[in-house]
A protein has these predicted regions:
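ATP-grasp fold ATP-binding core
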Residues: 124-125, 148-170, 189-206, 211, ...
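Conserved beta-strand signature within the Rossmann-like core of class I S-adenosyl-L-methionine
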Residues: 517-524
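ATP-binding N-terminal substructure of ATP-dependent carboxylate-amine bond-forming enzymes
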Residues: 1-109, 141, 389-390, 400-413, ...
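Peripheral (often C-terminal) accessory segments that flank ATP-dependent C-N-forming ligase machineries
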Residues: 317-434
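Conserved ATP-binding module of the ATP-grasp superfamily
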Residues: 130-132, 154-157, 171-206, 236-242, ...
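A conserved helix-loop-beta module that forms one wall/lid of the active-site cleft
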Residues: 99-167
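Active-site "cap" helix and flanking loop/linker of ATP-utilizing ligase/carboxylase catalytic domains
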Residues: 255-275, 281-282, 291-350
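A short glycine-rich, Lys/Arg-flanked "PGG" loop and its adjoining helix->strand segment in the class I
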Residues: 502-516
Length: 564
């Protein structure tokens, strides 16, 4: 059985492992050393290792040696069939190893052009392709000189070698540029290496796309096209909001694909995946950056297969091992079978979260494929989101109906903006003091008002002997069969010390007991205990396809909603 080596197996690159096994080969992960002795570099390595938990297959694991020569000798003994990078930081080492072992790969002379952002654009300019003006600077003074000499206005600052939007700053003027440079020159890149040089580029305004290509001996084909939607933070960071698939080409997008082919040719890319990020403005398409590895974002094979009937790592192996299959796929028209969205979670401020209600909420979305957030033990600190590294996780949506995907996406975005405690909860909601006599009388009065409307379920902490309706506490909810015309929730003391994750799950379970056309009634004495209070309760009922009804004059404060 031949070995196939995956250098730095992370994110979507994890899919390589099963694909290698499916080709009757043995997967070998080559784990790279930390890029430096900084805390950030150690955290990056820890993140790489945590990704192994997502691999449900057997593989061999080897480690980079102290010198390149030792690493090369170790890999040579494996007699590998192919060496591929599993993520961006594995591209350089994988390319060097494959070249030195005379394996199919991208030419070593093009390594700078496919890994260093400034070199990419130099190569495009040399080939008379549209590129972005920019310069590598090593000081704030050098950046100011370049800014003034080029008569720049808005600029983008980014590390020369990094990935996604890590370390990227968008600056509206010189003052913002200077401030961002001072911050970045005192920081590290995505791999924990100190930033002693930065790339200053003119800003291109437009719509941002990804064109994923696959290359076989310099011939390219499209696998998927995505559109990015980002948000600029107050600090100038560039935050991913969501990515969506392009299922049919719109105006200007065919030209984008042609330009992507030209870029791959100019950079001398011969084999494997080409993850290219582009902008389209009034002048047409222009490259932002290209990465010779699979699309990131932890896109699992089942998610991608449902969207396009293929996934990149499998198609990548075709480009090396099965060129006939590659060329057969290349002749097929571009067709996606479902619409996909990757929603990145945006944390609005530094928080210490104690639970993640979104874990349970997300499962109820009709287009939900997966929610990827680390399990919170006791509590976990999350930084305000500034880039992809400070996003705590992602939600994956896929459905044949685009309207359903976008509806679920808008719900998730509304949670972020209006009821973030339903995403990551600090468990800080105040449990109001309740006048037992007053509120219990209110509950009985509400029940009596509801009797003309049909069957009633009371989910309650306190049972009422004088009410002839079905009553249950939270623990007994699983034993309730059937659906009711009216469901009234009277829970407060019993949920006061529960996690927001459990409270949200309990409310969702209760909402399922309401008939179509029936109503849910949540008084203030209950919704005060729900994450984000009334807004959180409203978000959950809207999520379950309830219509929020007008409040009724003279009734106690209450959320009323009807099931559609």
């Amino acid at each position: 059985m031949r070995n196939i080596v995956v250098v730095q197996c992370k994110s979507t690159g994890i899919n390589y492992i099963q694909d290698i096994i499916d080709r009757n080969c043995n997967p070998v992960i080559l784990e790279m050393n930390a890029f430096s002795d900084t805390e950030e570099a150690e955290m990056h390595l820890k993140e790489v290792r945590s990704g192994y938990n997502l691999i449900n297959a057997d593989y061999d694991l080897i480690y980079e040696k102290d010198t390149y020569e030792e690493t090369l000798e170790m890999v040579k003994k494996l007699d590998p069939l192919v060496i591929v990078p599993g993520t961006e930081d594995g591209v350089i080492l994988a390319t060097k190893l494959a070249n030195d072992l005379n394996l199919l790969c991208n030419p070593i002379e093009n390594l700078d052009a496919i890994t260093l952002k400034n070199e990419m654009h130099k190569r495009l300019a040399e080939n008379n392709l549209r590129s972005i003006r920019g310069r590598i600077v090593t000081s704030v003074e050098e950046a100011i000189e370049y800014y003034d000499s080029q008569h720049l206005d808005e600029v983008v600052i980014k590390p020369q070698y990094s990935f996604c939007s890590v370390g990227v700053r968008i600056c509206s003027n010189k003052e913002e540029m200077i401030k961002s440079l001072h911050e970045l020159f005192n920081s590290t890149n995505a791999y924990g290496t100190e930033l002693d040089e930065l790339l200053i580029q003119e800003r291109i305004r437009g719509e941002e796309y990804v064109v994923n290509l696959m290359s076989c001996n310099g011939v390219h084909r499209v696998t998927t096209i995505w559109k990015y939607h980002k948000i600029k933070t107050h600090e100038g960071g560039h935050v991913y909001d969501y990515d969506e698939t392009i299922n049919e080409l719109g105006i200007g997008e065919a030209e984008l694909v042609e330009y992507a082919y030209d870029v791959a040719d100019a950079l001398g890319i011969k084999y494997g995946p080409v993850h290219g990020e582009y902008m389209i403005d009034e002048k047409g398409p222009v490259l932002i950056e290209v990465n010779c590895r699979p699309h990131g974002g932890n896109l699992d094979a089942k998610f991608l297969d449902r969207i396009s009937g293929q996934h990149e790592t499998d198609s990548s192996l075709d480009s090396y091992l099965n060129p006939d299959k590659f060329h057969q796929d290349r002749q097929m028209p571009y067709k996606l079978y479902a619409h996909g969205v990757l929603k990145s979670i945006i944390v609005p401020k530094d928080i210490t979260a104690k639970s993640s209600p979104l874990q349970n909420i997300g499962k109820n979305l009709k287009s939900h494929h997966r929610t990827l957030i680390g399990q919170i033990e006791d509590s976990q600190f999350f930084l305000k989101t500034q880039d992809i590294e400070t996003s705590p996780g992602d939600i994956y949506l896929v459905h044949e109906d685009k309207n359903q995907v976008m509806k679920d996406l808008e719900f998730l975005r509304s949670l972020e903006q209006r009821a973030f405690q339903l995403v990551l909860s600090e468990e800080t909601h105040e449990n109001a003091n309740i006048d037992d006599l007053s509120y219990l009388n209110d509950i009985k009065s509400i029940v009596n008002n509801l009797k003309p409307y049909g069957t009633i379920l009371l989910v309650t902490d306190t049972f009422f002997d004088d009410l002839s309706i079905v009553q249950t506490d939270a623990e007994g909810l699983d034993k309730i069969d059937g659906e009711f015309d009216c469901v009234l929730i009277n829970l407060n003391k019993s949920i006061a010390n529960e996690s927001d994750e459990k409270i949200a799950a309990l409310l969702l379970k209760t909402l399922k007991t309401v008939k179509v056309g029936g109503g849910i009634y949540i008084p203030k004495t209950t919704y005060d205990h729900i994450p984000n209070g009334r807004l959180g309760a409203e978000a959950l009922v809207k999520f379950m396809n309830f219509k929020i009804e007008l409040p009724v004059h003279k009734l106690p404060r209450m959320l009323i909603a009807s099931k559609r």
